[in-house]
């Protein structure tokens, strides 16, 4: 695959998102960072500020998401907008790479766990670097495989 055929879709947050973006920049890969007004952006390269209408397009029921992920999420405007930007990242991506911990129920812990779940729902190839097991895993449709 050629670097000019790749784009790193991210959310401009610190941590793993910023590191993926920095790696993309080092290797000459285009970068699009979905964000919203008022978000604290760690990456400014390729910043794409979503409109309110675009954010609404990525809206997901918190009740549905909580049931799917087996955890409770805050019902705040800021959290909803973060979820909506994650939806846009996954919707635009062809393959999804996240960092976190794979749980016994096959969900992934951490903010990127939501991206992994969206990827599974959108039938996108998804890869998780499990920080506990120090290795990459791929979702095969039924389970995570090393």
Segments the model singles out, each with a brief description of its role:
Residues 1-145:
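Acidic/glycine-enriched connector segments
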């Amino acid at each position: 695959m050629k670097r000019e055929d790749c784009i790193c879709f991210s959310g401009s947050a610190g941590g793993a998102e910023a590191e993926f973006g920095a790696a993309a920049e080092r290797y000459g890969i285009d970068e699009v960072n979905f964000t919203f007004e008022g978000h604290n952006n760690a990456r400014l390269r390729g910043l794409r500020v979503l409109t309110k209408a675009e954010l609404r397009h990525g809206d997901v029921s918190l009740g549905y998401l909580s049931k799917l992920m087996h955890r409770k999420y805050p019902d705040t405007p800021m959290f909803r907008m973060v979820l909506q930007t994650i939806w846009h990242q996954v919707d635009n991506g062809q393959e999804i790479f996240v960092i976190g911990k794979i749980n016994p129920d096959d969900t992934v812990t951490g903010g990127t766990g939501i991206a992994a779940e969206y990827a599974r729902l959108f039938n996108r190839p998804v890869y998780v670097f499990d920080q506990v097991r120090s290795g990459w895993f791929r979702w095969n449709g039924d389970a995570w495989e090393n």
